[in-house]
């Protein structure tokens, strides 16, 4: 049992360490002008979406004495409405960033691949938002600790799968093999998605949302830079993600229908 626990802790730490290898991304940014422009574009979008409205409302609140919460709600309602469109562009840019690397892939990369993966990423993001809201509605007021624990586990699975899904797609790894990797290396992916999940849980502040989006920009391109981890032997029990496999399968089926229609 102690040997299994040691292997689990080792993989969790390994995944966590890989998720903070920002130095690798910085080296790429320093040497790649195209990548720099895309990251700057993402930062500009986030600044317009979150930082500017926050600065305006904060300044207004500290300037006037009367209640301006209704104005704040209107401002952030507008931000949330256009956020959907922003994230679609945002994920397309992220996938384009991934495509510029010279990692050996099993098939050529097309623009249609980028658009399809961007749509899937957007659907993942929307699905996670709905799931988190449902968990809060059912558990938060009664079992807040349980609510946070469930959200954390789900979010780590989401973030790690979302980040590695692009690489697996371009390596032509089928969906069942992707799920199998996640089931066998769940401890590694738990560590990889830890920071992003904690940010997401506490992303009720514009500054945290801004930080989360910039961090995710790096987290999604890192799998194309770091050494990919594959299960060599079963060092600890795997988990069952068949439900996740079914959901992802439906998304991929929808993308195939879109590709065939074009």
Curated annotation (Swiss-Prot):
One of its GO terms (cellular component) is membrane. Keywords: Membrane, Transmembrane, Transmembrane helix. The chain crosses the membrane at residues 42-62, 71-91, 115-135, 145-165, 185-205, 206-226, 235-255. It is a multi-pass membrane protein. It is found in: Membrane. It comes from the Viruses. This is Uncharacterized protein L211.
